[in-house]
């Protein structure tokens, strides 16, 4: 527990040194390129197309982030997990550096092309050279992508196997069930609330205010951030938290010289909130102070940790030439952590040892210019810190990860009392390591410095920073993978849609169906003309697809201006085109329009081409005729549907007469007669005793349903 709290600054470094958007300072490290599992020859394979590359890079980026998130899990901070975490981190850094090297090569080529362009176009001002962090990888082969993906997957699986072995050997690291975790959390919260009761009782007391503020700060460090508290997920974490909280309470009473009561009432916000339940709050303060006043010294023989005897309380020696960690809170006077009473005094009382020990002579050195191309490993904090170049890291669409350590997330509130005997309290924001201030005059700040407890390479992984962008919304969602990218650079995942979810087509024309299967539409054609296939599906120039109308069903027949009639059953019949006394004319497709408006169709020009069957099983014969085969049935038996259409085992289709089912001939409302053999004959359209009528195109419909065409109207 404590080893994680005091090394937050060190743990942040590994997260901030990510390849694709590296604007942070880097630490000089070893070369991880040999750790990559990508074959050297894979870069010579087939390149991923430009329109598909961005989505693959996004998917690959999310894999890196997920792997890092595993390392930042709170309960993996125990020393038993160190080797497994180092192994996984090495693989992550190896694959990350492979991408960095590829990007460096491509960027150098890009600069040469830009220089050549400027020489050929010296007056051009519109095109500017991109910096390295603005430049994105433009060439990646499918083999490289697949090998990177598989490498990260196998690394995570190996880590999970190592974790399982570790937890089998150390039973106190076995994860709690949900019920066990809830009970453990309740026990820890109860003890923390007792500490808060002591804090509220003495924070307005001028004599003991500094110790009360320090008590609150230590409790907050143990519990974690208010918006992301530490999970009590196993037995060891629970025991360490309870021990830490008990020792924090004991430290308060030893440093103040007060006696610890045998029982302290726990703070309950539903009863003791200083604003909403001020009477209950004052009653709790009074009860706690009275319990402390009436307590004896018997508690000193039952302390959680051993306290050494000393005649003088010596303050901690101030450190020189510290390099301030980006996660450490900033204070007015840079005071040391308060571990004893302010003044040295003669006493035989036990001296409280600091919960958070400040390392002597930690991070030192000077800031210098970094190398041209940095690597990514957090080698050690005991060395020279150099300024890294502007090569970008993984976070393409958001700020550098290191930026977040200068702006901590919203902390737990600290209750700051007003001067004198006033009972009003004010809640003010507090940093992760807590800024503890007096009210007026003298400063009693408490600075909790991070400490590097491990100096081996790639062994420190801190909690991932929380982005400070608001509001949070989904920037992009991939329907094929279910991955959501948020505006703050984080990612979310969901299961493939199945069953009651509708089909969904993403920007790449990939459709995820209800059953979770995926179908792929045509790739965008880019500047190709729109094309409609035999199924009335049109692929447009931008790659989008539109579908023709379904049968209208139960709608009345309708004839448009071109004499094309859509019947109630969805069928379409074509009337003669108005000829207006024009002679017969045959167009380029061998379709002849006669003088009476009738149309006859000749064979399509064959141009001596052989028969050809396209991907939709539509065959164009040598004489220009077209036959439509069914979709291949793949060795299925012959099958006849309700319309008497038989699909044979070889995929061919034969059409029988429409079944008449021994019904007599029948004429419908449109004067269309279906005979007993299934044939259909068409009578004249019913006129309903209407007189002859001539429309705007000089076409006259007579009482018997026939039509005559007059000359075109000349204007």
UniProtKB/Swiss-Prot annotation:
Q: What is the role of the protein in this entry?
A: Staphylocoagulase is an extracellular protein which specifically forms a complex with human prothrombin. This complex named staphylothrombin can clot fibrinogen without any proteolytic cleavage of prothrombin.
Which residue ranges traverse the bilayer?
A: none
Cited SUPFAM superfamilies: Staphylocoagulase
Q: Where is the composition biased (Polar residues)?
A: 431-443
Task: Output the Gene Ontology terms for molecular function.
Answer: peptidase activator activity
Record remark: domains = The C-terminal tandem repeats are not required for the procoagulant activity.
Q: Which Pfam families match?
A: Coagulase (PF08764), Staphylcoagulse (PF04022)
| Range of residues in the leader sequence | 1-26
Entry keyword annotation includes Repeat: yes
InterPro entries cross-referenced by the UniProt entry: Staphylcoagulase_N_1 (IPR043072), Staphylcoagulase_N_2 (IPR043071), Staphylcoagulase_rpt (IPR001443), Staphylocoagulase_N (IPR014874)
Q: Which organism is it from?
A: Staphylococcus aureus
Which keywords does the record carry?
A: Prothrombin activator, Repeat, Signal
- Database matches in Gene3D superfamilies: Staphylcoagulase, helix bundle domain 1, Staphylcoagulase, helix bundle, domain 2
sequence repeat residue intervals? 495-521, 522-548, 549-575, 576-602, 603-629, 630-656, 657-683, 684-710
What is this protein identified as? Staphylocoagulase
Q: Where is this region: Disordered?
A: 306-348, 430-470, 674-697
**Basic and acidic residues composition bias: residue spans:** 306-327
Q: Which domain of life is it from?
A: Bacteria
């Amino acid at each position: 527990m404590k080893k994680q709290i005091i090394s937050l600054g060190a743990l942040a470094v590994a997260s901030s040194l990510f390849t694709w958007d590296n604007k942070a300072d880097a630490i000089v490290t070893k070369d991880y390129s040999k750790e990559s599992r990508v074959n050297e020859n894979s870069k010579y394979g087939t390149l991923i197309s430009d329109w598909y590359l961005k989505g693959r890079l996004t998917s690959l980026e999310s894999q890196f982030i997920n792997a890092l998130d595993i390392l930042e899990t709170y309960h993996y901070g125990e020393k038993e997990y160190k080797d497994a975490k180092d192994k996984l981190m090495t693989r992550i850094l190896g694959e990350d550096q492979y991408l960095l090297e590829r990007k460096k090569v491509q960027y150098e080529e890009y600069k040469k092309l830009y220089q050549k362009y400027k020489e050929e176009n010296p007056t051009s001002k519109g095109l500017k050279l991109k910096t390295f962090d603005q430049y994105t990888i433009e060439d990646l082969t499918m083999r490289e992508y697949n090998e990177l993906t598989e490498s990260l997957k196998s690394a995570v699986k190996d880590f999970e196997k190592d974790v399982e072995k570790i937890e089998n050997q150390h039973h106190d690291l076995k994860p709690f069930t949900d019920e066990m975790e809830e009970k453990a959390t309740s026990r820890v919260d109860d003890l923390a609330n007792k500490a808060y009761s002591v804090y509220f009782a003495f924070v307005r007391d001028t004599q003991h205010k500094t110790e009360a503020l320090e008590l609150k700060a230590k409790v907050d460090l143990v519990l974690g951030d208010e918006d992301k508290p530490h999970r009590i997920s196993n037995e060891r974490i629970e025991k360490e938290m309870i021990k830490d909280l008990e020792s924090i309470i004991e430290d308060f009473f030893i440093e103040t010289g007060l006696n610890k009561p045998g029982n302290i009432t726990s703070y309950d916000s539903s009863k003791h909130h200083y604003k909403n339940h001020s009477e209950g709050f004052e009653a709790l303060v009074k009860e706690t102070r009275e319990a402390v006043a009436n307590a004896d010294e018997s508690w000193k023989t039952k302390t959680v940790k051993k306290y050494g005897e000393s005649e003088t309380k010596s303050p901690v020696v101030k450190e020189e030439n510290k390099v301030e960690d980006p996660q450490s809170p900033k204070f007015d006077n840079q005071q040391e952590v308060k571990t004893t009473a302010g003044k040295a005094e003669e006493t035989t009382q036990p001296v409280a040892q600091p919960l958070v020990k400040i390392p002597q002579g930690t991070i030192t050195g000077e800031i210098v210019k970094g190398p041209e191309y940095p690597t990514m490993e957090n080698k050690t904090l005991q060395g020279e810190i150099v300024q890294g170049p502007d090569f970008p890291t993984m976070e393409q669409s958001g700020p550098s990860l290191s930026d977040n350590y200068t702006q901590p997330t919203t902390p737990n509130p600290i209750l700051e009392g007003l001067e004198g005997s006033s009972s009003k309290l004010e809640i003010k924001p507090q940093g992760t390591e807590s800024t503890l201030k007096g009210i007026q005059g003298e400063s009693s700040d408490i600075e909790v410095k991070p400490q590097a407890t491990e100096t081996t390479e790639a062994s420190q992984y801190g909690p991932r920073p929380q982005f400070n962008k608001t509001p949070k919304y989904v920037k992009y969602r991939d329907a094929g993978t279910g991955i959501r990218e948020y505006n703050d650079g984080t990612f979310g995942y969901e299961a493939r849609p199945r069953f009651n979810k509708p089909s969904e087509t993403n920007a790449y024309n990939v459709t995820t169906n209800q059953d979770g299967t995926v179908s792929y539409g045509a790739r965008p054609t880019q500047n190709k003309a729109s094309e409609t296939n035999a199924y009335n599906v049109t692929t447009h120039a931008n790659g989008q697809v539109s579908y023709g109308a379904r049968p209208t069903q139960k709608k009345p027949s309708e004839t448009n201006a071109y004499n094309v009639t859509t019947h109630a059953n969805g069928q379409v019949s074509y009337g003669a085109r108005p000829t207006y006394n024009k002679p017969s004319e045959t167009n380029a497709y061998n379709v002849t329009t006669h003088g009476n408006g009738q149309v006859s169709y000749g064979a399509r020009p064959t141009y001596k081409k052989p028969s050809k069957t396209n991907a939709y099983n539509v065959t164009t014969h040598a004489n220009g005729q077209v036959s439509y085969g069914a979709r291949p049935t793949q060795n299925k038996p012959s099958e006849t549907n309700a319309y008497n259409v038989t699909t044979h085992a070889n995929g061919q289709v034969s059409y029988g007469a429409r079944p008449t089912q021994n019904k007599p001939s029948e004429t419908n409302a449109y004067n269309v007669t279906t005979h007993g053999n299934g044939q259909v004959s068409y009578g004249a359209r019913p006129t309903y005793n209407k007189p002859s009528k001539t429309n705007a195109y000089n076409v006259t419909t007579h009482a018997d349903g026939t039509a005559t065409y007059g000359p075109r109207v000349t204007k």
